[in-house]
Structures are given as C-alpha cells and as structure tokens.
Amino acid sequence: MATGLAVAGFGAAKAIASPIMQSLLNNLGEGGIFKMFYILAAVYFVMMFIGHLLLAKPADWHEPQTKAAGEGILATLKREPLTSYIGIWLMFYLNITCGLALISQEKMIVKCIGLASSVGIISTISAVFNAGGRLGFSAWADKMKDRNTIYKMIFILSIVFTAAVMFTGGIKNGDGNILLIILVLALIFVVNAGYGGGFSNVPTLLSDHYGMGSISAIHRITLSAWAFAGLTGNQMASAIVNHTGSFIEVHGVKVNPVGYQNVLYVTLALYIVSLCLSLFLVRPTKK
C-alpha cells in the first residue's frame, strides 16, 4: 500500500491539475499556453524542492542486502527462471499500452456518447479512479500470498468490460442510450483503475521475486516497459482512429465512433495476452 500511496500522485495530479490548467488557459489570453507552463514550472519547482528536503531515511534503518557483492543485474534475474521476469515486463508493458490507448481517446469517446458538456467532470472522475486504483489494488495485493494474483484480477476486469462495450457497440450506439453510456463510462473508469493498479504493484511484485536489496536496479530496468508503452499506446490508438472508420459530427463535434470501437478490438486481444502471461509465465514466489 505504501507504494500505491506514493504513486497515487500520478492519478491525483490529473484530477487536481487538469481544471487548474484549463482555468489558466481560459484566463491568460494570448500566449496562454507558454504562460501556463511558466507558472506550472515555478509551482512545481517549489513543491518538488520542498519535497526533497522532507525525504530522509529513518535514523536506525539499514537497507537489506540480499544482493551478493559484485552480482550483476543479469545474475540477479537468474535467481528465478528468466521467463518470470520476461512475463512481468511484458504484462506491465501491455497493461500500460492498453491503458494509454484508451485514455488518449477518452475525451473524444465521452463526446461521442453525447456527454461533451461533461468531459471535464468525467476526466476528473477517471483521474480519481486512476489514483484510487493505485491505492486500492496495492492495498488489496498486500493481503494476497502471491501479488501476481492482483494482475490476474486487473486483466480479468479489463477483459470483461472491454468485451462488453465491444460486443454491444457501446461507443457507436451510446448516444442517447443510458445503459450503454453507463457501460462505456464503467470501461473508462475500470481501465484507469487497472492502469494505476498495475503500475503501483510492480515494485512489490519484483521485491517478492528478487528481494528488496535488488529492487532499485530491477525496477529501473522494468520501467523501460513504461517508456516503450508511452511510445506505442497513444500512437497505436491514433493510427487506428485515423485509418479506420470515418469522422462524423455528433452534437457539433467531429468524432469517429467506429475508430474508437476498433481500438477496443486491439486492447481486448492485448489484455487476453497479458492474462495468459500472468497465468502461465510469471511463476508464483516460493514464499
């Protein structure tokens, strides 16, 4: 849960900063974008500088040394079957890719189902789910013998809601249909929560497999999955939306319902692959 609390700031920041940024853009006039970034840079600098001053190790705490002297990162990974680490890296990458694919199209999907006037509110709620997923799933995982179980839960939930929206055509047919609107919003919130929960549980999953003494080096390498997902998730969704379906006008907004639906076909397949990795490639810990 401590890890979840630490990284919940990612989701909470979206909920807090989005309306502030929008307000700044609306009130700063000409050149509002670069003025906004100057203001945010100053605020973030002060907050981060104060934050780093408050960080300190407890006086009597000593870092556990489970890593042998001179042991390289590859030797550390080989303490367990290397396929376990490959599975962890891949399912982390795929979960983030799927999350970013949907989140990057979130506002347009909301407009597509007829809620253009509520985009800001829904974006804030989804950010709360993002932060809540980091806290909730990490706290839930603390009660599990094998932390990989939480990933199985995340992937199953994501598969169920993605499939439900896909097979009902929720995005294409949601405008004016309250049940489909609720289903599409539920998908957005579940994916945001799973995106956050998958991120927050990686350090503890790695520590269970390789020990706290090696966590910094292994976590550093594992975060490359996040970087690669950042390069592929948004671009994948944009490519699908721009090259499939067609843009139409809904309540004065140009959207591509078929394109957004097609994104779900890809994310559903990737979530199924992720679940298979979690089930068959990531070995349970010996604890």
Regions found by a protein language model. Give the residues of each.
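Flexible cytoplasmic inter-helical loops of multi-pass small-molecule transporters
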Residues: A56-L74
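A late C-terminal transmembrane helix in Major Facilitator Superfamily
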Residues: K14, H209-S246
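Intracellular juxtamembrane helix-capping segments at the cytosolic ends
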Residues: M1-A2, G197-Y210
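Helix-loop-helix hairpin linking two adjacent transmembrane segments in secondary transporters
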Residues: F10-A59
